[in-house]
């Protein structure tokens, strides 16, 4: 009986050890940065400008809401040799990727709009920052 227990423990150990995934490493390091309203950043041949916050109806941190709300911002993407493009980016509860630009060697995503609303801060006193990831 003792032999069977030891055998089962060894089999279980082997099964769990085999199920472990080897850590993956990425050859690309992600760069994250913030832009204030009116600020721009050059990334390779692409310039991103944070133009405005069009809407911020996100539910404040310290309140229970029926609807999570959303934030909508406008950005301008200028790529060398092409006409500038203005895009609206929506941050909502879906958590979907907000990809601003894709090329062969570059993906630019809008990750977050800060600060997240609080009832203690008046809406017109907020200094917004758009966090981007490359």
Give a label for each model feature:
Residues 1-23:
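Bacterial Sec-dependent N-terminal signal peptides
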């Amino acid at each position: 009986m003792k032999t069977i227990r030891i055998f089962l423990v060894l089999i279980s150990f082997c099964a769990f050890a085999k199920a472990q995934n080897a850590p993956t490493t990425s050859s690309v390091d992600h760069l994250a940065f913030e832009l204030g309203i009116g600020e721009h950043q050059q990334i390779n041949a692409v310039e991103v400008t944070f133009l405005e916050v069009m809407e911020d109806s996100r539910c404040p941190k310290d309140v229970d809401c029926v609807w999570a709300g959303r934030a909508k911002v406008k950005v301008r993407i200028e790529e060398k040799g092409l006409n500038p493009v203005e895009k609206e980016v929506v941050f909502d509860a879906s958590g979907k990727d907000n990809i601003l630009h894709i090329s062969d060697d570059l993906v630019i995503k809008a990750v977050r709009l800060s600060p997240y609303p609080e009832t203690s801060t008046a809406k017109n006193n907020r200094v917004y920052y758009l966090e981007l990831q490359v």
